[in-house]
Regions:
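Phosphate/anion-contacting hairpin/loop surfaces
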Residues: 64-209, 213-222, 227-228, 232
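Basic, nucleic-acid-binding surfaces and adjacent catalytic neighborhoods in DNA/RNA-processing proteins
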Residues: 22-35, 127, 132, 185-316
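Catalytic cores of large soluble enzymes that bind and process phosphate-bearing ligands
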Residues: 2, 177, 235
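Extended, highly charged segments
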Residues: 1-62, 89-98, 105-111, 117-118, ...
Length: 316
């Protein structure tokens, strides 16, 4: 399942390519056809993310609520007038591109970003956000949603309810509502006897945080994953600020890098990490390998159905 930075990055790309434009909306697969017809020919005002949830706000005051789940993908691809490949639940392209003129395509930087894929386990799959398709500077693009957990049409009031179910999002650090949620999360943290590793994965506490950021933040701060929430709350601001920093980097660069400069491949004269997830990390999916800081073996356990990684020496 993609972590929150992937969804925020996707929202940014959708706004860059389609924001403020009149859109053609369809459901080639057919499962969203009736809803698509209600927003076809209307303006996409904005795409915005909260945690792992994506909201596409149309001028008709109707909102498409998307959650990719474990296998969903939302790709920005070259526009083609015939039916796109695969089981496309939702298809978007600019109305002006039906004539093939003046399309706004991805920037070179965005094209070079390539596919962003995340996986919750070591198996193949995951969620892709952006295809590394070769495009000319004025080639039309489309957005195609495949295999989501949710794709539904909701009202503004229903969107507010959905956001109200979520916790604080580290990628919305200055949002007034999010700041209120953050303070409430901190209050709940001080009363919780659950482990901090469990709380970090709870979307009602930390919206958008997934398995990778959970493991890496706890390592970077030297916190034992079994530490109770009420104990870890003494370091709540450190946890929050590290999440803000790491997830903002992930949103900007399209990959998760968590190692500090002194532990980079160049500084340590070691080979770069080779993993489908990409990026340099301390413990995630490094079970049995030497810790980059102390040299002891990275540990692994399945906790609440999810893989947890930590260094028993650095995280006492």
């Amino acid at each position: 399942m993609p972590e929150g930075h992937v969804i925020h990055r996707l929202a940014r790309h959708l706004n860059q390519n389609f924001g403020g434009q009149v859109m053609r909306v369809s459901s080639p697969q057919g499962r969203f056809a009736a809803e698509a017809a209600l927003i076809d020919g209307t303006q996409l005002c904005q795409a915005r993310a909260w945690g792992k949830h994506l909201f596409l706000e149309f001028g008709s005051k109707r909102i498409v609520h998307i959650h990719l789940g474990l296998i969903g993908s939302f790709r920005i691809e070259p526009y083609q007038s015939d039916t796109p490949w695969g089981q496309v639940r939702l298809h978007l392209h600019r109305a002006i591109d039906d004539g093939g003129a003046d399309a706004y395509a991805l920037s070179n930087t965005d094209r070079q970003a390539g596919s962003v894929k995340t996986q919750s386990t070591g198996t193949a799959g995951g969620a892709a956000m952006l295809d590394n398709a070769a495009q000319s500077d004025n080639q039309a693009v489309a957005a195609n949603l495949r295999g989501p957990q949710w794709c539904r049409l909701i009202t503004e009031a229903e969107m507010d309810i959905e956001i109200g179910k979520l916790g604080a999002d580290p990628l919305r650090p200055t949002d007034p509502l999010n700041l209120e949620l953050k303070e409430e999360v901190f209050r709940r943290l001080t009363r919780s006897r659950r482990s901090i590793s469990s709380l970090l994965m709870d979307q009602k506490f930390f919206a958008g945080v997934g398995n990778i950021y959970r493991a890496e933040v706890l390592f970077r701060l030297g916190i034992n994953p079994e530490t109770r929430g009420d104990v870890a709350s003494e370091r709540k601001e450190e946890i929050w600020e590290d999440l803000v920093e790491l997830m903002a980097y992930g949103e900007q660069h399209g990959r998760i890098d968590t190692v500090r400069q002194e532990h980079s491949p160049e500084a340590m004269e070691r080979a770069p990490r080779e993993d489908d997830h990409g990026g340099e990390v301390y413990v995630y999916r490094r079970a049995g390998q030497p810790c980059l800081v102390c040299g002891d073996g990275v540990q692994h356990a399945v906790v609440e159905g999810r893989n947890l990684f930590w260094c028993p020496t650095c995280q006492r």
